Amino acid sequence: MKTEIITSDVLIIGGGTSGCYAALTIAEQNPELKVVIAEKANIIRSGCLAAGVNALNAYITEGRKPEDYVDYATKDANGIVRKDLLLSMSQGLNRVTAKLEELGLVILKDENGKYVTRGNRNIKINGENIKPILAEAVKAQKNVKVINHVNITDYITEQDKVTGAYGFDVNEKIAYIFSAKAVLCATGGAAGLYRPNNPGFSRHKMWYSPFNTGAGFAMGILAGAEMTTFEMRFIALRCKDTIAPTGTIAQGVGAKQINSLGEVYETKYGITTEERVYGTVAENQEGRGPCYLHTEGIKEEQGKDLLKAYLNMAPSQTLKWIESGKEPNEQDVEIEGTEPYIVGGHTASGYWIDDARRTTLKGLYAAGDVAGGCPQKYVTGALVEGEIAAETILKDLKQEEEGQQSEGQASKEQLEKLAQAVDQEYESCFAEKKSFFGTEQIEEAMQKVMDAYAGGIGTNYRYNEKQLNIAEEKIDQLFALTKDLTAKDTDDLLHIYEVKERLVVCKSVIAHLKARKETRWRGFGQNMDYPGTKDDWDKKAVNSVYENGKIKILFRDLTQTPDFGQKGGTL
């Protein structure tokens, strides 16, 4: 393969929500620094915002304060959060919202010029073009270089510091070596670990981006970064088949969750995110399904508004209504839970970070869905974390410069030597060797294992330790098969690394599920060996570090705030 070495001050891996905003922040505060964004897709329509959104779900509305949002997120996660992270995120929500509007995002306003709210924490937007707005702002920065269609596979470490990363072009046989003084991981969460709602050709009709494979998680795990709360999986309550969001209906028109008998069941089980999922699963198990959002009988105008609202983010739901011949006010909307995802924007799973968004690896920072401890980020929270991480990078680089500390970057000779090794690693996948399985077969087998033995849809999100032991054994067997996978082109090479990434994340998920010996979130998974909650787990984070080929479990006190500073990795 052809190899290219690119040097910068800051490398941002992932050009999604937080990655873009981090680049903007650095460009505005220090336009002399050279920033490179390595993006797997194309920055214009990449990441979770690719299809657009119709609301900003994290905003401090009139009469509320940031501490209220912290309380809400803490209760929703049943206490397993880092309040320091939640507070610093909440304090920036309205600031980044104002910046988005300044960049061109249309935020709906009432006759008095105030934002139109949707519930206590949301505001309505016309957000089909939210990602292009961010991307164009980034592309306008002279000191920011965006390299699209590059899949990053590993970090580069020198002198116990992350000094870059390497990857390959997904369209051409080019290997990239990125050297940087600071690296921000903003690669998003992990989808595709479990068997999805829809089979075959429609398997990517899912809640979370199917192209978010957990790459940032996997790189961090293998590099020895401390991870947190992978057992807190996210399961979304969605419109059946289309997997379209339900919040637009529930909050937009006040639709209640009802069973097949027409009974409102949400008050019976609770109204936190996971309780809404649990109630739906329980009603179906007890023979009172299907379950619905009760929209039949709403005003005709409200029905028309719903048809329009879904065009901004999930047009398939609008098409389903149209094809049925009935509008939203003429029929209820059937709902279901999705397969589990690992996503730090909704749960507390991800890198273990300090309040400045430093990871336990020196020189490496994390923001957005890849960062743990701070659930309920949504779009604006991811923006804030990108901003915080960027400002920390600026501060740390300035301290290094003033203290004349060693930057820890590899020399030209070291980079050239690394380039040869990377080329050999990738080229080995193109070698002719006998492989009985392809990436798609291994991925399907992985999803079947996770569904059956690690609490997927097929078991109503239930699992026990015996099942998890089986899952661990089978995932190890599947990972061993990946060494024989071969590629005809870079697209095949991409799929090889994606399935490897998912398998690494699966191993961590299984280890975390085994470690939390209670059922903290019934809707996100029930440990049938430990079906209740335990008081001694109320302030305990389940963390892990990959050492000598094994996942080592650590327990951290959530009330203690870590500070990794310039040293990295110390509590």
Features from the language model and the residues they span:
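Glycine- and aromatic-enriched mobile tails/lids
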Residues: 1, 5-8, 22-25, 29, ...
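N-terminal Rossmann-like FAD-binding beta1-loop-alpha1 element of flavoenzymes
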Residues: 10-37
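Short, well-ordered coil/turn residues at beta-beta hairpins
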Residues: 14, 180-182, 186-187, 367-368, ...
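Conserved N-terminal glycine-rich FAD pyrophosphate-binding loop of Rossmann-like flavoproteins
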Residues: 41-71, 247-249
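Conserved redox-cofactor binding core of oxidoreductases
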Residues: 45, 96-182, 186, 190-197, ...
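FAD-site-proximal beta/loop scaffold in flavoenzymes
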Residues: 154-171, 177, 329-371
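Glycine-rich loop(s) and the adjacent beta-strand/alpha-helix scaffold that form part
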Residues: 185-244, 379-392
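An anion/pyrophosphate-binding glycine-rich loop and adjacent beta-alpha core
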Residues: 219, 225-335, 340, 383, ...
